[in-house]
């Protein structure tokens, strides 16, 4: 699931220990969609959900829930930036250090989220994991993913990503976590390296001629994937089961 994974990557990048934020693995929706008995019942809503215990908020008698991945990361990030409630003080700021850098991070975050949202109809109409086979619709929607990637590509024309590689001590932003999660999701779960454009000149969704090539986005992806935070822990349920992978990687003819 893409949205819980971005939070997992964020927690690793931030160095937030499991003693402060415990990841609770729920059962498959077809098998109860429930949390283990030692934890509170799974609240309603799509995952991830951050359950804040009553003790963390004076006057509250019940759990407080945050039900959106970006909101969860922002909440935790502010706790770390302020060193509140026992959270480790941020070693670097993941949402920018001044008004301009914060605006840039929001720009990238919006496009990364747009990619993830646009992918839903691509996989729904174009793969065996979907509920309705409409290859033409899936093919059209993937062009909107390319539109967002093309914009990001233009922003990064002069950027060097070597510092993001494991051991190079480079830091990532929250928006970069979200973008990497999308690129990782399409590659590892759907077998599509979305950064590999055709290299051909095509018309985008607005009828403009563009070169379908995302060299800098690919450089970013290759650098980030070497980081410890990007690993997938099969024992923790971060790798889809074989049956699900088979459906996700079964593409209708003509989509790709």
PLM-predicted stretches and their roles:
Residues 97-105, 240-254:
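Amphipathic alpha-helical surface "interface" segments used
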Residues 8, 194-198, 236:
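Structured alpha-helical bundle/scaffold domains in large eukaryotic membrane-trafficking regulators
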Residues 85-96, 163-166, 232-236:
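Short, hydrophobic secondary-structure boundary micro-motifs
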Residues 25, 231-243:
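Acidic carboxylate-rich catalytic motifs and surrounding loops in phosphoryl-/glycosyl-chemistry enzymes
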Residues 2-139:
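GST-like domain detector, emphasizing the conserved glutathione-binding G-site
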Residues 82-85, 232, 245-256:
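Eukaryotic N-terminal low-complexity, Ser/Thr- and Lys/Arg-rich leader segments
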Residues 1-11, 176-177, 188, 227:
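Short, thiol/selenol-centered motifs that function as redox-active sites or metal-ligating centers
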């Amino acid at each position: 699931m893409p949205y819980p994974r971005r939070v997992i990557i964020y927690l690793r990048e931030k160095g937030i220990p499991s003693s402060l934020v415990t990841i609770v693995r729920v059962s498959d929706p077809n098998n109860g969609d429930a949390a283990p008995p030692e934890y509170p019942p799974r609240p309603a809503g799509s995952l991830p959900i951050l359950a804040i215990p009553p003790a963390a908020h004076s006057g509250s008698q019940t759990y407080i829930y945050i039900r959106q991945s970006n909101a969860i990361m922002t909440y935790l990030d502010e706790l770390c930036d302020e060193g509140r409630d026992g959270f480790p003080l941020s070693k670097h700021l993941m949402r920018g250090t001044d008004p301009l850098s914060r605006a840039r991070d929001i720009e990238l975050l919006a496009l990364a989220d747009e990619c993830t949202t646009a992918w839903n109809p691509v996989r729904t109409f174009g793969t065996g994991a979907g509920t309705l086979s409409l290859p033409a619709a899936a093919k059209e929607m993937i062009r909107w993913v390319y539109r967002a990637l093309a914009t990001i590509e233009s922003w990064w024309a002069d950027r060097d990503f070597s510092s993001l590689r494991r051991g190079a001590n480079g830091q990532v932003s929250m928006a970069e976590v979200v973008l990497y999660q999308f690129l990782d999701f399409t590659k590892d779960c759907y077998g599509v390296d979305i950064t590999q454009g055709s290299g051909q000149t095509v018309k985008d969704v607005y009828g403009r001629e563009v070169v379908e090539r995302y060299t800098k986005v690919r450089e970013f992806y290759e650098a980030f994937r070497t980081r410890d935070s990007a690993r997938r822990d099969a024992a923790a349920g971060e790798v889809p089961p074989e049956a699900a992978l088979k459906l996700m990687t079964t593409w209708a003819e003509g989509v790709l």
